[in-house]
């Protein structure tokens, strides 16, 4: 077996079905398997997916939502491929994507993990697909807005690396878990995903450990996927916001805290707490405004339409 493709599903039948279909529409000369882990979906998506792909996909059904890292690890343990590909359920691959990436990995034995270009539905680059590690200084530039103010600066925008050409290939610190191809021997060396990360930063942590072990993480944009990023919509549940900021703190504690002074750690904790509070407040205000808008009378709604149309 050459590639084991691991997809985690949680209440996303349409997206997951499209992702799997795009995989089976691939033009490949190698053998691959698809392993789908369902995190206790409540929308009957697992039943529909099993009916649709029962002869072509291996299924793991969980009785609880175990999170992204733990579910992927279940798939990795079952996988037989030389390469393990983490593929988000809200993505679609191009017909040449798998072939291109396997060919690249076969010809670059020093590369431990690779990712392709990841595009959003509007055709713009998903900036998460090639990143620097979130050091305290990098995080400060990102949170303070300096990275947006100087997007082409290698110094101020070392997180999203917008100073680099998105169509050129190069080593990077971090790739995105939406499409992350890793060698089996790398996983045997550095271990599985850290299951303390429920749904964010598990890819960042993995890439950090891969790089620390002497392997290269590589951005290879000779092929691409589309990432629909369903979970990034506004009005997101509180749990998602909480898990993101909890994972941010966990990553800092795991890899950076012992390198920095108490004052730097205090700064990081304060920054994470403030960002969490601001995000929750913003989402709450958005929900309240949305609720108020939906409860408006038909006459008010028509008047609002007229104003927005310039009537």
How should these model regions be labeled?
Residues 21-31:
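Short, acidic, metal-binding catalytic loop of nucleotide-sugar glycosyltransferases
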Residues 84:
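Short aromatic/hydrophobic "clamp" motif used to bind/position activated sugar donors
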Residues 22, 38-47, 64:
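A conserved acidic beta->alpha catalytic loop
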Residues 208-286:
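Active-site-adjacent helix/loop segment of glycosyltransferases
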Residues 133-172:
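Short, flexible, basic/aromatic active-site loop/helix in glycosyltransferases
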């Amino acid at each position: 077996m050459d590639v084991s493709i691991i997809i985690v599903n949680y209440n996303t039948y349409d997206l997951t079905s499209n992702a799997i279909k795009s995989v089976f529409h691939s033009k490949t000369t190698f053998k691959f398997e698809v392993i789908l882990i369902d995190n206790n979906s409540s929308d009957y998506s697992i039943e529909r997916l099993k009916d649709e792909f029962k002869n072509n996909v291996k299924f793991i059904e969980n009785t609880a939502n175990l999170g992204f890292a733990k579910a992927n690890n279940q798939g990795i343990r079952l996988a037989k491929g030389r390469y393990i590909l983490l593929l988000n359920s809200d993505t679609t691959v191009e017909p040449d994507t798998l072939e291109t990436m396997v060919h690249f990995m076969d010809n670059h034995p020093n590369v431990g993990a690779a990712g392709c270009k990841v595009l959003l539905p509007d055709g713009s680059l998903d900036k998460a697909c090639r990143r620097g590690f979130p050091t305290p200084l990098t995080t400060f530039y990102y949170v303070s807005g300096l990275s947006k103010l100087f997007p082409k600066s290698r110094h101020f925008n070392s997180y999203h690396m917008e100073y680099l050409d998105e169509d050129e290939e190069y080593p990077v610190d971090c790739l995105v878990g939406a499409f992350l191809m890793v060698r089996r021997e790398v996983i045997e060396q550095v271990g599985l995903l850290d299951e303390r990360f429920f749904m964010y930063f598990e890819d960042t942590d993995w890439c950090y450990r891969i790089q620390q072990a002497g392997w290269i993480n590589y951005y290879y944009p000779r092929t691409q996927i589309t990432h629909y990023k369903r979970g990034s919509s506004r009005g997101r549940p509180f749990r998602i916001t909480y898990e993101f900021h909890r994972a941010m703190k966990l990553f800092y504690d795991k890899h950076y805290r012992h390198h920095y002074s108490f004052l730097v750690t205090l700064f990081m904790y304060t920054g994470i707490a403030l960002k969490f509070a601001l995000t929750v407040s913003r989402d709450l205000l958005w929900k309240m405004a949305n609720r108020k808008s939906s409860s408006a009378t038909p006459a008010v709604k028509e008047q609002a339409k007229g104003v927005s149309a310039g009537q």
